[in-house]
């Protein structure tokens, strides 16, 4: 089974990806892991990626696409199938993935989209606070500290509501075009992500069993 998992930051995509891998035994292909492995193994694309990263530059799409292609061509993919997590990030990468799969004789069986209302995600992502003295991380709503005093805690710039909203807006714009592409191919299953983790996975599992 060859799958793609999508979802906005904070939607719980990583948690569900781990559960899918555990339950269905597919190879988990996350962008970060792929880059680290390609650079550690000094593959052609790994060396290219490292040359950009060492200069503090963004890795161009053709290199990212090449690293994905290298990974999808490995033997375990034909045996186990895969779950792509964090790629494609743009519609251009989605088209490149289509071409790669066709070239390798693979096909995408389904796209799992973990849906959570952006306003809920802003609450999830912007609630993180850090204790100035201990460095411990808490959440204003979901994991509040005992005896909370505002002056004892600070919030990272990345976690402030306005920053979180800007980040989500970018992700929504990019994600919608990718989802539309896969919807036209009849591959997308939307999963309600604003429920307990076990309930989300029950819905994911049901959808995947129907694909088998």
UniProtKB/Swiss-Prot annotation:
Cell compartments where the protein resides: Cytoplasm
Record has Protein transport as a keyword: no
Residue positions binding ATP: 10-15, 128, 137-138, 195
GO CC terms, sorted: cytoplasm
Pfam families hit by this protein: ADK
Protein origin, superkingdom: Bacteria
Assembly with partners or alone: Monomer.
Entry protein name: Adenylate kinase
């Amino acid at each position: 089974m060859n799958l793609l998992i999508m979802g906005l930051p904070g939607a719980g995509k990583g948690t569900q990806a781990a559960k899918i891998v555990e339950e269905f035994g597919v190879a988990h292909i996350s962008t970060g892991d792929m880059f680290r492995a390609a650079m550690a193994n000094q593959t052609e694309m790994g060396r290219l990626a490292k040359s950009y990263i060492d200069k503090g530059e963004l890795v161009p799409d053709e290199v990212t696409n090449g690293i994905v292609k290298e990974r999808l061509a490995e033997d375990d993919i034909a045996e186990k199938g895969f779950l792509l997590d964090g790629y494609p990030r743009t519609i251009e990468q989605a088209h490149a993935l289509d071409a790669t799969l066709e070239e390798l004789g693979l096909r995408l069986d389904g796209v799992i989209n973990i849906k959570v209302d952006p306003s809920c995600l802003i609450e999830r992502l912007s609630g993180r606070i850090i204790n100035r003295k201990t460095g411990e991380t808490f959440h204003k709503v979901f994991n509040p500290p005992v005896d909370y005093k505002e002056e004892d805690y600070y919030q990272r710039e990345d976690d402030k509501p306005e920053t979180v909203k800007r980040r989500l807006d970018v992700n929504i714009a990019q994600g919608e075009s990718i989802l539309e592409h896969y919807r036209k191919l009849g591959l997308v299953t939307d999963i309600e992500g604003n429920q307990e983790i076990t309930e989300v996975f029950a819905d994911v599992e049901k959808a995947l069993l129907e694909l088998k």
